[in-house]
Every structure is written in structure tokens, then in C-alpha cells.
Amino acid sequence: MDLITVAELHKPKRLICKRNLLPIDNLKIVFREVRDYFAGNVTGITRDETIAQNIMQLLFCKVFDEKSKNEEQLVDFASRPKENVNEFAKRIHKLFNVVKEKYLDIFDADEEIEISPNDLSVIVRKIEYYSLINAQRDIIADAFEELIGRAFRGGEGQFLHHAMSSR
């Protein structure tokens, strides 16, 4: 099955408002799936550091989007039923540009999401229905460690929690 067919099969059936986001108990499983998808499918992104950087960009987009919406607003970090993948990707890139402006101390001004529209669509769909801001703090910290532990462990094996994992 080609990517276009896969993308069509997985098109959302409805628009997602913030109130539709579901709490999740185990982010490790979801984040491991995202990391594994990157490692196995995203062309040109195979090093753990690059995978971690792109995933962090997307996670900041997701959290920022959730925090900036009221319960009745549509979330931007989600696919939409009548939207093609290029329109979707433009919306996610626009969201990341807002995130970069908000977090100048974390992201470089010239930093970009380096994922094709089709791959971006698949990855976003894995987490679009979940609320990351309503997850328990320790679950988020565990997920970050699971997701980017290999890329960002210090020489002694210590793990530095990212700013997003603290409230």
C-alpha cells in the first residue's frame, strides 16, 4: 500500500477540539511508537539526536497548542477531514514558527521541522487525540527519558529533563 492510500485510510472522521483530547496513562508506549516510526520510515533522519530534535519540536508544538486553546477551539496539532497533507504540513510549520518565537531560548530562529508532509501526518496522528498537558508529570518525564534518553544522556548516564516536562 502506498503512502497516499495509507494517508487516505487514516484521514480523521471529525475535527478535534481541545475538549475532545483524551487523558493518557502511558505516554511511553505512544512516544516509543513515534520514535520507532522516525527511525524506520523518515528518510534522512536516522541518528538518535536528529530524531530527538524533530520529536521535541513536535512535542513543543503539541503542548503549546493545547495551552493556547480554550475547550471549544479546534486544535491546530491535528489532521482535518477535508485537508490535504500539504495544507496540513503548512499549518504545523506555521504553528512551529509561533513556538520558535515563544521559546527563543530553546529553538534557533532558522530551525525547521525536517519531516515530509506524509511522515508528519502519520506522526501527528499518533498523538493528536491525547492531551499532553493533562498527563501526570512523572509520566511525561518517563516518556521523555524513553524517547530521547539515548540522544541526550550525559557521560555519566544522567538524564536532563527538558523544560517542557516541568510545570
Task: Give residue ranges: language-model regions.
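Charged, often flexible domain-edge or linker segments that flank or initiate folded functional domains
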Residues: 1-101
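Alpha-helix N-cap/helix-initiation sites
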Residues: 45-53, 133-137, 158-159
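Long recognition/docking surfaces used for binding and targeting
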Residues: 56, 60, 64-152
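Dynamic helix-loop-helix/coil hinge segments at AAA+ ATPase domain boundaries and subdomain interfaces
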Residues: 152-160
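Conserved S-adenosyl-L-methionine
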Residues: 162-167
